[in-house]
Structures are given as structure tokens and as C-alpha cells.
């Protein structure tokens, strides 16, 4: 057997004088020269960085744009203060606070935070892993990626968990708010910390309050952080993009929730179902443990300030300008007499400049409408009853002036009273009959009163030539006999 074969069986490789590069070798993932060059970049700038690269004889592991971006994003290394009254503040680290560069007990020993809105626990087998590819622009017979995400969010019933770098699509934000508030589904959203201002501006323009919306948990997450010995640090971005739905479906790919990705950029996503969803479930929990909640809601000014969005048009009606509360007079200061007199003078001038003519009040408008309806309506039709005739005569005589209205209503002669006198039931003095013209004709003539006579059947047959007297006279003559 050849020596090379024996070396292969024994695990030895050719070139035993040089160490082999394996995945476990530190030289693959770590370079002391790159660390020194990066510290020079964060502390002194790009020129010092390129000088260190040449001195250490390193290949150009950073492009010019990447080096410029890292130098711009560098910041001081701050640690949160542990004092009770200084929660959430940051202080510069000192030499005694420098911990181990290879071991972080706080990141490895602290328990992961609980999911605030809950998480569906489903231990059942989810089936075989299946994958379906979608592209943008869409392929033949496939929906656009934005439509796919919209349909899957609408179909969710237990959970919507999103990890995204850039989120500026208003339609997808409305879908998530609708799922959280109307269908009562827990919605988690982890965003890259450097692109959070764009998302907050979108929510403000849509009128969505991210701090008070129920079933909506929004947090920020960042990449790994490099901290130099000179108390400078730089953090990376979140490049993961996936949507976990109900714990059994995942949409993952290069698509971002922006208008440019839905219309201009080329991207692709994969719809995964089955057991692979458990891996994304675990990854989301890890990211949630490393995330941070949103800062406190911005405090409102004590004075009213109109929103920055489009204003509603003002009403052209003058009624809208009325104030139900009387304007408050300015308080007089306790200063010299000249200042108080000046304040009184300003108050009187404002009262004089205030226009006294205002628009018609609501009661005036209603009164004019009722008057118009009364005059333009059909005339009252007279009735045959005595009560209606009396009311009609009173209404007809109520518009002849103030002198006529002062007369007492009993002294007026009405058609109803004339009819009652004709029937022999009285009705007031005939001398006070009103000679005013009635709406239906002239005044009724006065009929003299006469005695009623009872006619027997024989007299009614013979007529007026009958010689028999009436029953009153006959009964009287009989009594005289």
C-alpha cells in the first residue's frame, strides 16, 4: 500500500508542515489584522483604516462604500445605568466595566422574554415540508408577491409574526392592523432599528397609534455589534425577511414591504409549509429575545396643535363661526396703573371691532320656514258643523287690524250664530251683527222671529184654507167653556 494511502487512512493530509484550514480553525472566522484595521476605522476614519490594511498586508476585505458606511454608523460605547432613578439612560463605560471579550453571561444565562401577546402551541405533526417559489415580476399563472402576502395575512386565524428590514407599504400595514383589531389575532412585528423612523412616519400618516393598538406588538432588532477597545461600536442590520402565519406557513425571501419592491425591484420568495415552520418558529423567538420595545410615546403639547396631515375645509356658513362660550376677558395684571389702563383700552377696542351683525339664528330660520308653509299651504275647507263654522269665522276676523282684535269675541255675530237664531235657539243680540264680508259671500239677512204652529195631518192635507185654529187657541177656548 502506498504511503499516501496509509496517510489518508490515518487521517493525515499532504503538506503536514502547514496547518489545515477547517471549519473549527480560528483562522477561518477570525483575523487579528482585520480586527486592528476595523478598530482604526471606527476610531480614526478611513485613511487610518487603509493605512492599517497596507501595514498588515491584508486583502481589501471592505469596499470603499462599506468602509464609509461603517465609519458613519460608528458611535460611542454606552451601557445602561444600573441606578434606580436612571433607568433607560446610558453612560460611558469605564475601564473597570469592561467585561470579557469572549463570554457574555447576560446574553447566555438570562431567560428569554415571554411573548407578550401569547403564542399558539401546536405539537401536532405539520406534515411533509413543501416549497413553492414566487417571483417579482410574477410568473405565468402566479400572483404578485404583494398579493400573496395580502392573501395569507387575510387567511391567518391564530398568528401573524413578521421580521422585516424596511416596512413602508401602507396596504400591508392596514392588513395587519385589521387582523389585530377586527379579527383579534396576535400580530408581532420585528423591524430593523435603523429603518424604524420611516415606519413611524408611515403610521402617523395613516393615523395608526402604534402604542395603543391592541394585539399589535412592535419591537426593533439589530444585527451583531462590534465593540472596540477604544469604546467605539458599530451594529449591523437585519437582513432576515420572513412572515410566519399560524405557526405552519412561512413566506421567506428577498422581498421587502416597500412600493419599490412591489413595482420596480426583482425579488423572489418561497412559501414553505410543513415541519420546516418549526425552524422559523424558533428563529423568531431568538430574534424576539434580542429585540427591544419601542420608546415611550411622544408626549403631547399642553397647547392644542393641529395635525400635520391634510386639514378639513372650513365651512362657508356663518353659523360655524359662532362660539357657544363667551370669550374670556384678558386678566388685568397687578403692575403699574398705566399697564392696567392699556389692557382695558385693548379690551374695549376689541369689543368695538367685534362685528355685531351675525347670521340668522336657528330659531329665526325655523320660524320663517313655518310662516312660508302656512301661507303657501292650501286654504282651510269650511265644515258644516257649528264648531268649525265658529272657528272659521274667528280666523277670518282675526286679521283686520289691532282695533278689531281688541273686541270681545262674544259680541261678534258669526254665521254660526245667525244659523242658530234662524233655528230659534238664540245666539246673541241681532243689533251687533257684523257687516263684514264673509269669504263665501255677503252677510246673512236677519230673519224675524215668529211663533211655531203645530199642523195636524188634516190641516197639512187641506193647506192654509183650513178653518181650524191651532192647538194652543183651541185648548184655551175649551178651558173657557
UniProtKB/Swiss-Prot annotation:
GO terms for molecular function: protein kinase binding. Residues 391-400, 465-474 have a biased composition (Polar residues). SUPFAM superfamilies: Phospholipase D/nuclease. Pfam families: SACK1. Residues 351-481 are annotated as: Disordered. It is found in: Cytoplasm; Cytoplasm, Perinuclear region. Residues 371-385 have a biased composition (Low complexity). Gene3D superfamilies: Endonuclease Chain A (3.30.870.10). Keywords: Cytoplasm. Residues 1-296 are annotated as: DUF1669. Its main location: cytoplasm. Directly interacts (via DUF1669) with CSNK1A1, CSNK1A1L, CSNK1D and CSNK1E. May interact with RAF1. All members of the FAM83 family of proteins share a conserved N-terminal DUF1669 (domain of unknown function 1669) domain of about 300 amino acids. This domain mediates the interaction with casein kinase 1 (CK1) isoforms. Therefore, it has been proposed to rename DUF1669 the polypeptide anchor of CK1 domain. Belongs to the FAM83 family. May play a role in MAPK signaling. PANTHER family: PROTEIN FAM83A-RELATED (PTHR16181:SF29). This is Protein FAM83E. The lineage of its organism: Eukaryota, Metazoa, Chordata, Craniata, Vertebrata. The gene is Fam83e.
Amino acid at each position: 500500500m502506498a504511503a499516501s494511502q496509509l496517510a489518508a487512512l490515518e487521517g493525515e493530509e499532504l503538506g503536514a508542515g502547514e496547518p489545515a484550514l477547517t471549519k473549527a480553525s480560528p483562522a477561518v472566522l477570525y483575523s487579528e489584522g482585520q480586527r486592528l484595521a476595523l478598530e482604526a476605522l471606527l476610531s480614526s476614519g478611513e485613511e487610518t483604516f487603509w493605512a492599517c490594511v497596507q501595514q498588515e498586508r491584508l486583502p481589501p476585505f471592505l469596499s470603499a462604500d462599506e468602509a464609509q458606511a461603517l465609519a458613519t454608523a460608528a458611535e460611542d460605547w454606552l451601557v445602561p445605568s444600573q441606578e434606580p432613578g436612571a433607568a433607560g439612560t446610558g453612560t460611558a463605560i469605564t475601564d473597570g466595566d469592561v467585561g470579557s471579550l469572549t463570554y457574555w453571561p447576560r446574553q447566555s444565562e438570562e431567560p428569554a422574554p415571554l411573548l407578550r401577546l401569547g403564542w399558539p402551541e401546536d405539537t401536532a405533526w405539520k406534515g411533509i415540508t413543501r416549497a413553492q417559489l414566487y417571483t417579482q415580476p410574477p410568473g405565468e399563472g402566479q400572483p404578485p408577491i404583494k398579493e400573496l402576502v395580502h392573501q395569507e395575512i387575510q387567511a391567518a386565524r391564530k398568528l401573524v409574526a413578521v421580521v422585516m428590514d424596511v416596512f413602508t407599504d401602507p396596504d400591508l400595514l392596514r392588513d395587519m392592523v385589521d387582523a389585530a383589531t377586527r379579527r383579534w389575532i396576535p400580530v408581532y412585528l420585528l423591524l430593523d432599528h435603523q429603518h424604524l423612523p420611516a415606519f413611524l412616519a408611515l403610521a402617523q400618516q395613516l393615523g395608526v397609534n402604534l402604542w395603543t393598538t391592541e394585539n399589535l406588538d412592535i419591537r426593533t432588532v439589530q444585527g451583531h455589534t462590534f465593540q472596540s477597545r477604544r469604546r467605539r461600536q458599530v451594529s449591523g442590520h437585519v437582513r432576515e425577511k420572513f412572515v410566519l402565519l399560524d405557526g405552519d406557513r412561512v413566506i421567506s425571501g428577498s422581498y421587502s414591504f416597500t412600493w419599490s419592491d412591489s413595482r420596480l425591484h426583482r425579488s423572489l420568495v418561497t412559501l414553505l409549509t410543513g415541519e420546516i415552520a418549526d425552524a422559523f418558529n424558533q428563529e423568531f423567538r431568538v430574534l424576539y429575545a434580542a429585540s427591544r420595545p419601542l420608546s415611550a410615546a411622544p408626549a403631547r403639547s399642553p397647547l392644542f396643535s393641529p395635525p400635520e396631515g391634510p386639514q378639513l375645509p372650513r365651512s362657508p356658513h356663518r353659523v360655524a363661526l359662532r362660539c357657544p362660550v363667551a370669550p374670556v376677558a384678558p386678566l388685568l395684571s397687578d403692575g403699574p396703573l398705566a399697564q392696567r389702563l392699556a389692557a382695558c383700552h385693548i379690551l374695549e377696542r376689541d369689543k368695538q371691532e367685534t362685528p355685531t351683525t351675525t347670521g340668522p339664528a336657528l330659531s329665526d330660520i325655523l320660524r320663517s320656514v313655518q310662516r312660508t308653509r302656512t301661507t303657501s299651504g292650501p286654504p282651510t275647507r269650511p265644515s258644516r258643523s257649528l264648531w268649525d263654522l265658529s272657528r272659521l269665522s274667528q280666523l277670518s276676523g282675526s286679521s283686520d287690524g289691532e282695533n278689531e282684535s281688541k273686541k270681545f269675541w262674544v259680541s261678534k255675530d258669526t254665521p254660526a250664530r245667525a244659523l242658530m237664531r234662524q233655528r230659534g235657539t238664540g245666539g246673541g243680540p241681532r243689533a251687533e251683527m257684523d257687516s263684514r264680508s264673509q269669504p263665501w259671500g255677503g252677510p246673512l239677512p236677519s230673519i224675524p222671529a215668529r211663533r211655531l204652529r203645530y199642523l195636524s195631518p188634516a190641516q197639512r192635507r187641506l193647506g192654509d184654507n183650513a178653518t181650524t185654529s191651532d192647538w194652543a187657541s183651541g185648548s184655551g177656548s175649551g178651558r173657557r167653556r
